[in-house]
Amino acid sequence: MAIDTVVLDIEGTVCPITFVKEKLFPYFLEKLPSFLSEISNFTSLQADDKDPIKAILSQLPEQIRTSKDSVLEYFNDLVRRDIKDPILKQLQGFIWKLGYENGDLKAPVYEDSIEFIKTFPSKTENKRIYIYSSGSIKAQILLFGYVDENGKSVDLNEYLSGYFDITTAGFKTQSSSYTKILEDIGKEHGGSVLFLSDNVLEVEAALEAGMESYVVVRPGNAPLTEDDKTKYKIITSLEQL
């Protein structure tokens, strides 16, 4: 069955895996203290607060939001352990948005990925691209809205048909998440849908759900075992599709 829909992972697939851990995460941790310093009472935060930071933090367990230091320590620990926490993702998305908008941040999407995203979609042939990342949908839209192309910031969101994250589809190593995506994009079968990721556990989950799925190998990605190399289809560039 011909592929008419591609679901893309982000880090390690369409942009360097180092961008998130060496640029986005440190930027978030650098800016977070100044935002927390503006809050005088962490115990009385409300979900309907007009301040988006306060509204996000109100979702934290009461035992965490006792003080600035407690909240800061909590998020530092989550980032250090790379925990995919929905509240953390919301907060990161808000702070990264400011960074993209003021020019501090620009996404280093691979040239082959930029070209693929621009050329694969076709309304006449009903070809579509979706994004599925552990980062929040807001963070995904931001990243693709501020892509570094030859030193200029370009917006690739117009080429994308939709986005999924752990709150809308589920965790990426669970096959049920890919079944949910197939349902949401109107696909009864996954044979015409290709999922690309650097993570073999995610690729395996997509295959279990009936999708086609390849492992993407990029500089800096975790090395594959010999078994992985024989078990999965592997590409090193989206030009190979």
Swiss-Prot record:
InterPro entries associated with the record: Enolase-ppase_E1, ENOPH1_eukaryotes, HAD-like_sf, HAD_sf
Pathway the protein acts in: Amino-acid biosynthesis; L-methionine biosynthesis via salvage pathway; L-methionine from S-methyl-5-thio-alpha-D-ribose 1-phosphate: step 3/6; Amino-acid biosynthesis; L-methionine biosynthesis via salvage pathway; L-methionine from S-methyl-5-thio-alpha-D-ribose 1-phosphate: step 4/6
Record keyword Nucleus present: yes
Reactions it catalyzes: 5-methylsulfanyl-2,3-dioxopentyl phosphate + H2O = 1,2-dihydroxy-5-(methylsulfanyl)pent-1-en-3-one + phosphate
Binding site for Mg(2+): D9, E11, D198
Location in the cell: Cytoplasm; Nucleus
Superkingdom of the organism of origin: Eukaryota
A single BP term in Gene Ontology: L-methionine salvage from methylthioadenosine
EC number: 3.1.3.77
EC main group: hydrolase
Cofactor (UniProt): Mg(2+)
Binding note for cofactor: Binds 1 Mg(2+) ion per subunit.
GO molecular function terms attached to this record: acireductone synthase activity; magnesium ion binding
Gene3D superfamilies: 1.10.720.60, HAD superfamily/HAD-like
Keywords from the named record: Amino-acid biosynthesis, Cytoplasm, Hydrolase, Magnesium, Metal-binding, Methionine biosynthesis, Nucleus
Residues noted as binding substrate in the record, renumbered to the chain: S133, S134, K172
Alphabetical list of Pfam families matching this protein: Hydrolase
Purpose of the protein: Bifunctional enzyme that catalyzes the enolization of 2,3-diketo-5-methylthiopentyl-1-phosphate (DK-MTP-1-P) into the intermediate 2-hydroxy-3-keto-5-methylthiopentenyl-1-phosphate (HK-MTPenyl-1-P), which is then dephosphorylated to form the acireductone 1,2-dihydroxy-3-keto-5-methylthiopentene (DHK-MTPene).
Assembly and oligomerization: Monomer.
Family statement: Belongs to the HAD-like hydrolase superfamily. MasA/MtnC family.
Protein name per the record: Enolase-phosphatase E1
Organism: Scheffersomyces stipitis (strain ATCC 58785 / CBS 6054 / NBRC 10063 / NRRL Y-11545) (Yeast)
